[in-house]
Regions:
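Peripheral (often C-terminal) accessory segments that flank ATP-dependent C-N-forming ligase machineries
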Residues: 304-314
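Residue-level marker for buried hydrophobic side chains located in beta-strands
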Residues: 23, 138-139, 263, 281
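Phosphate-binding site of ATP-dependent enzymes
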Residues: 136, 159-217, 269-282, 290
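Short acidic, Gly/Ser-rich segments with clustered Asp/Glu that frequently serve as metal-coordination loops
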Residues: 143-145, 285-292
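Active-site nucleotide/adenylate-binding loops and adjacent lid/helix of ATP-dependent enzymes
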Residues: 91-176, 196, 225-249
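Conserved N-proximal alpha/beta basic substrate-recognition cap immediately N-terminal to
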Residues: 3-12, 24-133, 146
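A long amphipathic alpha-helix within ATP-dependent nucleotide-binding catalytic cores
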Residues: 172-173, 180, 202, 215-277, ...
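Active/binding-pocket-proximal capping segment
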Residues: 289, 298-306
Length: 314
């Protein structure tokens, strides 16, 4: 199934690749089919051959198997991260990084901005149990998983199946992330680009939906200002700008030039206990290309400004 999904989505980079870039497809037949499609961007090239003629490779996200494949194919070492950078990318891709950035961010922006959000790194079954029993509703997360997977919703009881899941995650990943449950009203993200000099740049917003389990469903295609206006019905645009500026500083400090490429920070607008609204400024950090960036680039590059529709990327 993962290989089939990868094959089906191999055309997707055509919509966000740089002009003159080359998109690799899984088969020559698929490449010939794509070359005949008039609706696809004409500014990219296609190839089905995995040949070491490119100095730079831009994948959806980096993993050891891709690096190994590039090495075996003879690609130059400029085309992929070094062993040390891969270790660092894995480290900062874990949810522990989001916990760290959330704490630093809340200190950075001070008490004048309505924020909320706590997260805890738990290293033993006893600590996880104490966390679960002390929260009427909460989430437990595996440090490394994606798209809503690796998440358990708990309601103050410590069951045998839950204990089994916890022990498995602690055995394989050594820690579990615990987060209180919040009264979420809106999912959105700020999207960024980390450059080769270690600077992090804000590139826009994304507005997305998840199912009841927190699994990603779709992204809205809309102008950046429209998304900001939607979020600003809960918190002001100036607050969003302050959070974005603080995030650029904190992300650059965490990444420290180890990663070059797109990344996104998932956020939430939540209802507070007194009936007001607050922003959770760092729910997840996606250190890779993501559907929010894809939606942003598709709209900015291919949709007429001012067009409003319920079209989405799914």
């Amino acid at each position: 199934m993962p290989l089939m999904l990868a094959a089906e989505l191999s055309v997707l980079p055509a919509w966000y690749a740089e002009q003159g870039g080359t998109v690799w497809l899984d088969s020559a037949l698929r490449m010939k089919t794509m070359e005949r499609q008039s609706f696809l961007p004409p500014s990219v090239n296609w190839t089905s051959e995995f040949l070491p003629i490119y100095n730079k490779v831009i994948p959806w996200g980096w993993n050891p198997s891709l690096v190994r494949r590039l090495q075996e194919a003879g690609f130059p070492d400029t085309a992929y991260p070094s062993v040390e950078r891969m270790k660092r990318i894995r480290q900062i891709s874990g949810r522990q990084t989001a916990v760290k950035v959330l704490r630093r961010l809340c200190r950075h922006i001070g008490g004048n901005i309505p924020t909320l959000g706590e997260a805890f790194v738990l290293s033993s079954t006893e600590k996880v149990k104490a966390f679960v029993l002390s929260h009427p509703r909460a989430l437990l997360k595996a440090p490394w998983s994606g798209s809503g997977r690796g998440i358990q919703y708990v309601s103050g009881s410590f069951t045998i199946p839950l204990e089994g899941w916890i022990r498995h995650i602690l055995t394989t990943q050594h820690e579990v992330i615990g987060e209180p449950f919040y009264d979420k009203l809106l999912d959105f993200a700020m999207e960024f680009f980390a450059d080769e000099w270690g600077q992090v740049h804000f590139i826009g917003y994304s507005l997305f939906e998840t199912d009841k389990r927190g699994v990603y469903k779709e992204n809205l295609l809309a102008a950046d200002r429209v998304i900001e206006e939607r979020i600003s019905t809960y918190v002001s645009a100036e607050i969003l700008h302050q959070v974005g500026r603080a995030l650029q500083v904190e992300l650059a400090e965490v990444i420290k030039g180890s990663y070059e490429g797109y990344l996104g920070v998932d956020m939430m607008i939540c209802r507070t206990q007194n009936g007001g609204y607050a922003i959770h400024p760092c729910v997840e950090i996606n250190l890779r290309m993501n559907m929010g960036v894809v939606a942003r680039l598709i709209y900015d590059n291919y949709v007429c400004d001012g067009v409003q529709d319920r079209k989405s990327v799914v």
